[in-house]
Amino acid sequence: VDGAVTSRHPGEGIRSSVRVREPAIGTVGGVSTPETTPAAPDAVPGVDVAAVTNWFESSIDGAHGPFRFDVIAGGHSNLTYRVTGANGARYVLRRPPLGHRLASAHDMGREHRIVHALQHSAVPVAPALGYCADPAVNDAPFYVMGFVDGHVIRDRAAAEAVLSPAARRHAGESIVDTMAAIHAVDLDTVGLADLGKHEGYIARQLKRWYGQWNAQKTRELTAVDTVHDELLRRIPEQGPATIVHGDYRLDNCMVGDDGTVVAVLDWEICTLGDPLADVGLLQVYWTGPDDDASAWTGSATTAPGFPNRAELAERYAAASGRDLSQLPFYVSFAYWKLACILEGVYARYLGGALGQRDPAELEPFKLQVDGAAAKALATLESLG
């Protein structure tokens, strides 16, 4: 399950106090197992312990209380708890953020549906055990999965501590093979053909995120406007729609000791669309040992043994049979989208989402937006 996600910036001064999950950029301080915060048995933020205990015992086979709920730190995204029963059985509970009111942005039923459907595919996911939308049980809907043992690699130190160089190599290969498996899922067979619109994915994404940029920008940044216009003009013809994870990267996968992906995490923004959007985003997040730097530093995949970006792309092309001649377009799109997302985070923090802060303390956010926009433009220009 996803743990604490702490953005690493060019300036590290705010690293301990700023947590970002929209999505996270860079790396996370932490080790291979999720960071948890133990809660008093009868006082767990976001969980009505008595009512949820009753639900567990009546809805989940073999579940017996009392239960211990440990918060797995998760920033501003859906909250995740490790739940341990009296018999030692472990589960994972997911619910929307505290104070959350917009159901469409954190649709637990939709996320549960995706995870449950993918159990009948070649994609490794945690077992989906139950979903509850009854307000009499909790103040917000939640769903429960089985607990999966594995490593969530969030920084280079964790990669070197838990994976051998050979396992790092295999992790890169397994992450690509798993992504290809996601994109190969037969939508009708698993019942997800109506998960989203099939056509026009990139155009819709450009409209959505450019609207967000213009609504929240803190200053003019010509590169964002230029890249938007050029991307809109150059959209490649989309093939058949597939599942698009939307935030596919190393630390949204759990891997075993040998590097094999044992579960893909964080399906909350999954939809249908152009699979190459996932490929482009993985290229942005991934910096192999001999790759040029990304727009941010500290990638876990710089550790010796991990494959480089070109090797990932070659493996995906072989596994999927897809033409990657337009991959720079999708890499540029990924950088541009992340610039728009980070600008929104920066704007909210400038507006007091962290409390009163010195704007200079938040300057690293601005620098990351600038860097991502510059990378988007440079990558697009490489297409000629």
Predicted regions and their residues:
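ATP-binding pocket architecture of kinase catalytic cores
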Residues: P66-I243, G256-G259
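Catalytic-loop of the protein kinase fold
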Residues: I243-H245, L250
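C-lobe/activation-segment region of protein kinase-like
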Residues: D278-P289
